[in-house]
Amino acid sequence: FLQTGFSAHGSAFDEMHEVIANSTRYLTAEDMTALSTFLLGDNPPAPQPLPAAVSPDSGTGNGAGTLDAGRGHYMALCASCHGSEGLGRSLTMPPLKGNSTVRQADARNLVLAILVGLPKHPATQQGPTPLPGMPGFMQELTDGEVAALANYTRTALGGQPADVTAAQVADLRSAAGKSGHKAAP
C-alpha cells in the first residue's frame, strides 16, 4: 500500500495520496520493511473479518426506501468501475466490499471520496499500471443523494449502519470547499 497507494482494502486518499506519490513509493524494499515494522510492530494484528451486512432499518431511521435510492445511485455511478457487488477489478479498481473506508464507523472519508473524488495513482516499479482517478459527484448529487449513496455502500458493502444524514453531508461539502480537499483531475 505504501508504495502503490492501492490494496485489497482501499486506495490512498487526500494527504495520504500525496505522501505516497511524493515519498514512500520511492523507498527501497529494506526501507519499506523497516517502515512497516515501525508502523505495525513485529507482530501486526490479524485481519478482521468483514461484518455482515446490516438491515436497512439500522441506524438513524434511513429506511429501505432511502437505501433503494442509494442502490440506484451506486448502480448508475459506481458499479461500472467497482462492480455491482462491490468487488472491483483486479489491480485497476479497488473493491468497495470490505474496503477500509467503507468499513469505518465514521463515514467522513467515504462521503469526501463521493464528493471530491480520488486522484490518479501514478505507475510505480511495484505497480507498473497507473490507476485512474475517481470522479467526485459534488456537482451532480444533492446532500440527500450523497447520504443515500453512502448509506447504501456502508450497509451493503461494509457492514455499517445507515447513519449518514444530509446535514452531515452538507457540513462536509462546505468543509471540503474551504479546506483544500482536491477533486480528482
Show where each model-derived region lies.
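Sequence/structural segment immediately N-terminal to covalent heme-attachment motifs in c-type
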Residues: 62-91, 98-116, 182
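Flexible coil segments in periplasmic/lumen-exposed cytochrome c-class electron-transfer proteins
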Residues: 8-77, 124-185
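Detector for the c-type heme attachment site
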Residues: 3, 21, 40, 82-88, ...
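Sparse, context-dependent recognition of short Cys/His-centered cofactor- or disulfide-binding micro-motifs
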Residues: 1, 12, 81, 95, ...
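Extended, polar beta-sheet/loop recognition surfaces of beta-rich domains
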Residues: 2-6, 97-148
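Short acidic alpha-helical/loop segments enriched in Asp/Glu that coordinate divalent cations
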Residues: 49-53, 84-94, 126
